[in-house]
A protein has these predicted regions:
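Short helix-boundary/capping micro-motifs
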Residues: 10-28
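Central regulatory/effector-binding core of bacterial HTH transcription factors
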Residues: 89-152
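Alpha-helical linker/hinge and terminal dimerization helices associated
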Residues: 42-43, 64-86
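A late-sequence structural motif
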Residues: 104, 252-290
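Flexible hinge/capping segments at coil-to-helix
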Residues: 153-191, 197
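Beta-alpha-beta core module
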Residues: 151-158, 162, 224-269
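Secondary-structure junction motif
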Residues: 185-206, 273-277, 281
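A short LG(V/I)-centered, amphipathic sequence patch enriched
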Residues: 40-57
Length: 290
Protein backbone atom coordinates (compact mmCIF):
# COMPACT_ATOMS: atom_id res chain seq x y z
CA UNK A 1 0.00 0.00 0.00
CA UNK A 2 1.21 3.51 -0.82
CA UNK A 3 -0.20 7.03 -0.93
CA UNK A 4 -1.31 6.57 -4.55
CA UNK A 5 -3.46 3.63 -3.50
CA UNK A 6 -5.14 5.80 -0.88
CA UNK A 7 -5.66 8.59 -3.41
CA UNK A 8 -7.34 6.15 -5.81
CA UNK A 9 -9.47 4.81 -2.97
CA UNK A 10 -10.52 8.37 -2.04
CA UNK A 11 -11.36 9.10 -5.69
CA UNK A 12 -13.68 6.08 -5.89
CA UNK A 13 -15.32 7.13 -2.62
CA UNK A 14 -15.81 10.67 -3.95
CA UNK A 15 -17.21 9.74 -7.37
CA UNK A 16 -19.04 6.58 -6.36
CA UNK A 17 -17.89 5.08 -9.63
CA UNK A 18 -14.71 3.28 -10.75
CA UNK A 19 -14.78 4.69 -14.28
CA UNK A 20 -15.17 8.30 -13.13
CA UNK A 21 -12.48 7.81 -10.50
CA UNK A 22 -10.11 6.47 -13.16
CA UNK A 23 -10.79 9.47 -15.41
CA UNK A 24 -10.23 11.89 -12.53
CA UNK A 25 -6.93 10.22 -11.62
CA UNK A 26 -5.76 9.94 -15.26
CA UNK A 27 -5.53 6.16 -15.24
CA UNK A 28 -7.51 3.17 -16.49
CA UNK A 29 -10.38 1.49 -14.70
CA UNK A 30 -8.60 -1.86 -14.48
CA UNK A 31 -5.80 -0.21 -12.49
CA UNK A 32 -8.27 1.34 -10.06
CA UNK A 33 -10.09 -1.97 -9.63
CA UNK A 34 -6.83 -3.82 -8.99
CA UNK A 35 -5.62 -1.25 -6.44
CA UNK A 36 -8.90 -1.37 -4.54
CA UNK A 37 -8.80 -5.17 -4.54
CA UNK A 38 -5.25 -5.06 -3.14
CA UNK A 39 -6.36 -2.69 -0.39
CA UNK A 40 -9.27 -4.94 0.52
CA UNK A 41 -6.92 -7.94 0.70
CA UNK A 42 -4.40 -6.01 2.79
CA UNK A 43 -7.00 -4.82 5.30
CA UNK A 44 -8.98 -8.04 5.17
CA UNK A 45 -12.23 -6.17 4.69
CA UNK A 46 -14.64 -5.15 1.94
CA UNK A 47 -14.30 -1.40 1.38
CA UNK A 48 -17.09 -0.85 -1.15
CA UNK A 49 -20.55 -2.23 -1.79
CA UNK A 50 -20.86 -2.63 -5.55
CA UNK A 51 -24.20 -2.20 -7.33
CA UNK A 52 -25.11 -1.85 -11.00
CA UNK A 53 -25.29 1.95 -10.68
CA UNK A 54 -22.63 2.96 -8.17
CA UNK A 55 -20.34 1.88 -5.39
CA UNK A 56 -20.80 2.90 -1.77
CA UNK A 57 -18.46 2.79 1.19
CA UNK A 58 -18.91 0.03 3.73
CA UNK A 59 -18.36 0.68 7.43
CA UNK A 60 -14.74 -0.41 6.98
CA UNK A 61 -14.45 1.84 3.93
CA UNK A 62 -15.68 4.85 5.90
CA UNK A 63 -13.09 4.15 8.57
CA UNK A 64 -10.31 3.92 6.00
CA UNK A 65 -11.47 7.14 4.32
CA UNK A 66 -11.22 8.90 7.68
CA UNK A 67 -7.62 7.75 8.17
CA UNK A 68 -6.58 8.21 4.55
CA UNK A 69 -7.64 11.86 4.70
CA UNK A 70 -5.54 12.36 7.81
CA UNK A 71 -2.56 10.61 6.20
CA UNK A 72 -2.83 12.77 3.08
CA UNK A 73 -3.04 15.94 5.15
CA UNK A 74 -0.04 14.94 7.26
CA UNK A 75 2.03 14.28 4.14
CA UNK A 76 1.16 17.72 2.77
CA UNK A 77 2.02 19.26 6.14
CA UNK A 78 5.35 17.40 6.16
CA UNK A 79 6.17 18.73 2.69
CA UNK A 80 5.68 22.27 3.98
CA UNK A 81 7.77 21.65 7.08
CA UNK A 82 10.62 19.75 5.43
CA UNK A 83 10.66 21.05 1.88
CA UNK A 84 12.46 24.09 0.57
CA UNK A 85 9.26 25.91 -0.28
CA UNK A 86 6.69 27.17 2.22
CA UNK A 87 4.12 27.76 -0.52
CA UNK A 88 0.78 26.12 0.19
CA UNK A 89 -0.48 24.13 -2.76
CA UNK A 90 -3.04 21.46 -3.54
CA UNK A 91 -6.76 21.14 -4.14
CA UNK A 92 -9.43 22.47 -1.81
CA UNK A 93 -13.09 21.54 -2.33
CA UNK A 94 -15.55 24.11 -0.97
CA UNK A 95 -19.33 24.06 -1.14
CA UNK A 96 -21.94 26.82 -1.12
CA UNK A 97 -25.66 27.25 -1.28
CA UNK A 98 -26.52 28.75 -4.67
CA UNK A 99 -27.27 32.21 -3.30
CA UNK A 100 -24.02 32.39 -1.34
CA UNK A 101 -22.12 31.15 -4.39
CA UNK A 102 -23.60 33.94 -6.52
CA UNK A 103 -22.80 36.61 -3.95
CA UNK A 104 -19.47 35.51 -2.54
CA UNK A 105 -17.98 32.91 -4.89
CA UNK A 106 -16.16 35.32 -7.24
CA UNK A 107 -14.66 37.28 -4.35
CA UNK A 108 -13.42 34.11 -2.67
CA UNK A 109 -11.76 32.90 -5.86
CA UNK A 110 -10.03 36.27 -6.26
CA UNK A 111 -8.82 36.40 -2.65
CA UNK A 112 -7.50 32.85 -2.73
CA UNK A 113 -5.73 33.45 -6.05
CA UNK A 114 -3.99 36.50 -4.59
CA UNK A 115 -3.04 34.98 -1.23
CA UNK A 116 -2.52 31.33 -2.19
CA UNK A 117 -1.98 31.13 -5.97
CA UNK A 118 -1.01 27.44 -5.94
CA UNK A 119 -4.22 26.29 -4.28
CA UNK A 120 -6.66 24.78 -6.77
CA UNK A 121 -10.05 25.93 -5.48
CA UNK A 122 -12.87 23.61 -6.56
CA UNK A 123 -16.26 25.24 -5.86
CA UNK A 124 -19.65 23.55 -5.99
CA UNK A 125 -23.19 24.55 -5.04
CA UNK A 126 -25.87 22.37 -3.48
CA UNK A 127 -28.65 22.35 -0.90
CA UNK A 128 -27.74 22.84 2.75
CA UNK A 129 -28.30 19.23 3.83
CA UNK A 130 -26.21 17.83 0.98
CA UNK A 131 -23.37 20.22 1.77
CA UNK A 132 -23.34 19.07 5.38
CA UNK A 133 -23.36 15.42 4.31
CA UNK A 134 -20.55 15.99 1.80
CA UNK A 135 -18.36 17.65 4.43
CA UNK A 136 -19.04 14.82 6.89
CA UNK A 137 -18.09 12.25 4.23
CA UNK A 138 -14.92 14.09 3.10
CA UNK A 139 -16.31 14.92 -0.34
CA UNK A 140 -15.91 18.59 0.57
CA UNK A 141 -13.24 20.18 2.75
CA UNK A 142 -15.55 22.97 3.86
CA UNK A 143 -18.89 24.58 3.05
CA UNK A 144 -20.76 27.82 3.61
CA UNK A 145 -24.26 27.11 4.93
CA UNK A 146 -27.01 28.83 6.92
CA UNK A 147 -26.77 28.15 10.67
CA UNK A 148 -27.47 26.39 12.97
CA UNK A 149 -25.08 23.44 12.97
CA UNK A 150 -25.56 20.70 15.54
CA UNK A 151 -23.29 17.85 14.40
CA UNK A 152 -20.51 17.15 16.91
CA UNK A 153 -18.08 16.13 14.15
CA UNK A 154 -18.23 19.60 12.61
CA UNK A 155 -16.63 22.87 13.60
CA UNK A 156 -18.08 26.14 12.37
CA UNK A 157 -17.12 29.80 12.13
CA UNK A 158 -19.64 32.61 11.93
CA UNK A 159 -18.96 34.39 8.64
CA UNK A 160 -21.74 36.90 8.03
CA UNK A 161 -25.31 37.90 8.76
CA UNK A 162 -27.91 38.01 6.00
CA UNK A 163 -31.51 39.13 5.73
CA UNK A 164 -34.29 37.33 3.89
CA UNK A 165 -37.02 39.34 2.18
CA UNK A 166 -40.28 38.38 0.52
CA UNK A 167 -40.03 38.99 -3.23
CA UNK A 168 -43.32 39.56 -5.05
CA UNK A 169 -44.69 40.85 -8.35
CA UNK A 170 -45.09 44.64 -8.56
CA UNK A 171 -48.88 44.52 -8.23
CA UNK A 172 -48.87 43.77 -4.50
CA UNK A 173 -48.95 46.68 -2.07
CA UNK A 174 -48.41 44.62 1.08
CA UNK A 175 -47.82 41.10 2.34
CA UNK A 176 -51.36 41.06 3.70
CA UNK A 177 -52.65 41.58 0.18
CA UNK A 178 -50.41 38.76 -1.04
CA UNK A 179 -51.69 36.36 1.61
CA UNK A 180 -55.29 37.14 0.73
CA UNK A 181 -54.87 35.66 -2.75
CA UNK A 182 -57.35 32.79 -3.29
CA UNK A 183 -54.74 30.72 -5.13
CA UNK A 184 -51.42 31.62 -3.55
CA UNK A 185 -48.40 30.50 -5.56
CA UNK A 186 -44.87 30.11 -4.21
CA UNK A 187 -41.78 29.92 -6.41
CA UNK A 188 -39.28 27.75 -4.57
CA UNK A 189 -36.11 25.70 -4.93
CA UNK A 190 -35.97 21.93 -4.36
CA UNK A 191 -36.63 20.23 -1.03
CA UNK A 192 -33.75 20.92 1.34
CA UNK A 193 -33.49 24.61 0.44
CA UNK A 194 -33.14 26.76 3.55
CA UNK A 195 -35.15 29.64 2.08
CA UNK A 196 -37.93 27.32 1.00
CA UNK A 197 -38.15 25.96 4.54
CA UNK A 198 -38.40 29.49 5.95
CA UNK A 199 -41.16 30.35 3.46
CA UNK A 200 -43.15 27.21 4.21
CA UNK A 201 -42.89 27.71 7.98
CA UNK A 202 -43.92 31.36 7.58
CA UNK A 203 -47.04 30.34 5.66
CA UNK A 204 -47.89 27.79 8.36
CA UNK A 205 -47.79 30.55 10.99
CA UNK A 206 -50.42 32.33 8.88
CA UNK A 207 -52.53 29.13 8.74
CA UNK A 208 -51.86 28.70 5.03
CA UNK A 209 -51.21 25.13 3.95
CA UNK A 210 -53.10 24.97 0.67
CA UNK A 211 -50.99 26.74 -1.94
CA UNK A 212 -49.30 25.91 -5.23
CA UNK A 213 -45.54 25.38 -5.46
CA UNK A 214 -43.49 25.87 -8.59
CA UNK A 215 -39.99 24.42 -8.23
CA UNK A 216 -37.12 26.19 -9.98
CA UNK A 217 -33.45 25.26 -10.15
CA UNK A 218 -31.85 28.69 -10.43
CA UNK A 219 -32.14 32.14 -8.88
CA UNK A 220 -32.71 33.61 -12.33
CA UNK A 221 -35.63 31.26 -12.87
CA UNK A 222 -37.22 32.23 -9.55
CA UNK A 223 -36.92 35.94 -10.33
CA UNK A 224 -38.26 35.49 -13.86
CA UNK A 225 -41.39 33.75 -12.60
CA UNK A 226 -41.94 36.42 -9.94
CA UNK A 227 -41.50 39.22 -12.48
CA UNK A 228 -44.06 37.51 -14.71
CA UNK A 229 -46.59 37.73 -11.89
CA UNK A 230 -46.80 33.98 -11.32
CA UNK A 231 -45.91 33.88 -7.63
CA UNK A 232 -43.63 35.01 -4.80
CA UNK A 233 -40.56 33.71 -2.99
CA UNK A 234 -38.09 34.29 -0.16
CA UNK A 235 -34.57 35.35 -1.17
CA UNK A 236 -31.60 37.12 0.47
CA UNK A 237 -31.87 40.91 0.32
CA UNK A 238 -28.28 41.11 -0.99
CA UNK A 239 -29.13 38.94 -4.00
CA UNK A 240 -31.91 41.30 -5.04
CA UNK A 241 -30.01 44.54 -4.39
CA UNK A 242 -26.87 43.27 -6.14
CA UNK A 243 -28.26 41.54 -9.23
CA UNK A 244 -31.98 42.22 -9.60
CA UNK A 245 -32.67 45.75 -8.33
CA UNK A 246 -33.74 46.88 -11.82
CA UNK A 247 -36.22 44.07 -12.33
CA UNK A 248 -39.98 44.57 -12.11
CA UNK A 249 -40.36 43.00 -8.69
CA UNK A 250 -41.00 44.23 -5.17
CA UNK A 251 -39.49 43.27 -1.81
CA UNK A 252 -41.09 43.32 1.63
CA UNK A 253 -39.39 43.10 5.00
CA UNK A 254 -40.11 40.13 7.24
CA UNK A 255 -40.10 39.78 11.03
CA UNK A 256 -36.57 39.32 12.50
CA UNK A 257 -37.24 35.72 13.50
CA UNK A 258 -38.03 34.96 9.84
CA UNK A 259 -35.56 37.22 8.06
CA UNK A 260 -32.37 36.75 10.08
CA UNK A 261 -29.83 34.27 8.68
CA UNK A 262 -26.33 33.56 9.94
CA UNK A 263 -23.97 32.08 7.38
CA UNK A 264 -21.24 29.85 8.80
CA UNK A 265 -18.24 28.03 7.39
CA UNK A 266 -18.29 24.36 8.40
CA UNK A 267 -15.49 21.79 8.29
CA UNK A 268 -14.63 18.52 9.99
CA UNK A 269 -12.84 18.88 13.31
CA UNK A 270 -10.44 16.09 12.32
CA UNK A 271 -9.52 17.76 9.01
CA UNK A 272 -7.59 20.70 10.43
CA UNK A 273 -4.24 19.12 9.62
CA UNK A 274 -4.85 20.13 5.98
CA UNK A 275 -2.57 23.09 5.15
CA UNK A 276 -4.99 24.30 2.45
CA UNK A 277 -7.94 24.24 4.82
CA UNK A 278 -5.96 26.03 7.53
CA UNK A 279 -5.06 28.76 5.05
CA UNK A 280 -8.65 29.06 3.87
CA UNK A 281 -10.03 29.30 7.41
CA UNK A 282 -7.46 31.87 8.53
CA UNK A 283 -8.13 34.05 5.48
CA UNK A 284 -11.91 34.09 5.45
CA UNK A 285 -12.55 33.94 9.17
CA UNK A 286 -10.66 37.25 9.41
CA UNK A 287 -12.23 38.85 6.31
CA UNK A 288 -15.78 37.74 7.23
CA UNK A 289 -16.59 37.90 3.50
CA UNK A 290 -17.30 41.60 3.52
Amino acid sequence: MNINDLNLFAAVAFHGNFTKAAEAMCTVQSNVTARIKNLEEEFGATLFLRTSRKVELTSAGKTLLHYSKQITNLIEEAKLSIGKSDLIKGQLKVGFTETTMALKGPGIVTEMAEKFPLVDLDLTSAMRDKLINDVLNYRLDAAFIPAPVYNEELEHIHIMDERIVAVTPLKFKSLDELLEQPQLKAIVFDEGCFFRARLENWLITHDITNYHKTVMHSIEGVVNFIESGIGFSFLPQDIISTFYHKRKIKTFSLPPEVSAVKTVLIYRKDNLSSPMLKAFISLFSSLKLQ
